């Protein structure tokens, strides 16, 4: 069964709602160097993470700033959303954290690490180290844009890569079933797709997203 991650959570009550709906992971965007209504401090992320059950993964999303790591006592995983190199991924893995590395897919199906177009050799190097890769839509916002990318390209990557692939980018309750059927990812990730306003989740949308994903 495909797993679900609800990301960009800013309130403990939204994390509790996601947990009750049957999500497998919750994510907080922690002290990233971009302007987003979903950004929280490490201390606030700990508060959010503390309300979910022990079997729910608690993912801290970081972006070229690892300083918060020592203050994220409640996190069980990190999602590296910047240009972090394989050595950094390995260092975090040695701390006992699950490591997810984000890559971006553009509308032509090309894969990017930040502003660098990358090929299979670079992807393979990361895949030897990380626990999963996340495919998001390439955009100026660095994620959370609500835009989907080429799912056919993502499906090819799922078949090619030797690690679990998490699909993100423009997913919502209305299209996630189609995305799962086409891409066959290990998990799906949504943030803006289940919000009633930026940074504030919609309980009904979360529940429907989980139901639609797990019905496939």
Swiss-Prot record:
**Keyword Amino-acid biosynthesis appears in the UniProt entry:** yes
Q: One Pfam family name from the record?
A: PRAI
Q: In which pathway does it act?
A: Amino-acid biosynthesis; L-tryptophan biosynthesis; L-tryptophan from chorismate: step 3/5
Similarity-based family: Belongs to the TrpF family.
Q: Which UniProt keywords apply?
A: Amino-acid biosynthesis, Aromatic amino acid biosynthesis, Isomerase, Tryptophan biosynthesis
EC number, as in UniProt: 5.3.1.24
Catalytic activity reads: N-(5-phospho-beta-D-ribosyl)anthranilate = 1-(2-carboxyphenylamino)-1-deoxy-D-ribulose 5-phosphate
Show the GO MF annotations.
phosphoribosylanthranilate isomerase activity
**What is the protein's given name?**
N-(5'-phosphoribosyl)anthranilate isomerase
Q: Name one GO biological process term.
A: L-tryptophan biosynthetic process
Keyword Amino-acid biosynthesis attributed: yes
Source superkingdom: Archaea
Identify the InterPro entries for this entry: Aldolase_TIM (IPR013785), PRAI_dom (IPR001240), RibuloseP-bd_barrel (IPR011060), TrpF_fam (IPR044643)
């Amino acid at each position: 069964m495909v797993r679900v991650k609800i990301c960009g959570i800013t309130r403990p009550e939204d994390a509790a709602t996601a947990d009750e709906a049957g999500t497998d992971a919750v994510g907080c965007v922690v002290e990233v160097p971009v302007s987003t209504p979903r950004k929280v401090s490490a201390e606030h992320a700990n508060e959010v993470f503390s309300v979910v059950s022990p079997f729910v993964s608690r993912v801290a999303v970081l972006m070229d700033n690892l300083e918060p790591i020592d203050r994220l006592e409640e996190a069980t995983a990190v999602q590296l959303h910047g240009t972090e190199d394989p050595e950094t991924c390995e260092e975090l893995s040695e701390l006992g954290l699950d490591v997810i590395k984000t890559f971006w897919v553009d509308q032509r199906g090309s894969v990017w690490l930040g502003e660098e177009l990358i090929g299979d050799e670079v992807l393979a190097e990361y895949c030897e180290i990380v626990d999963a890769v996340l495919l998001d839509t390439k955009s100026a916002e660095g994620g959370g844009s609500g835009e989907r990318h080429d799912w056919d390209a993502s499906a090819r990557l799922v078949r090619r890569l030797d690690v679990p692939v998490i699909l993100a980018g423009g997913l919502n309750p209305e299209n996630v079933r189609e995305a799962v059927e086409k891409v066959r990812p290990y998990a799906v990730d949504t943030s803006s797709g289940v919000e009633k306003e930026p940074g504030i989740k919609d309980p009904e949308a979360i529940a429907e997203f989980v139901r639609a994903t797990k019905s496939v």
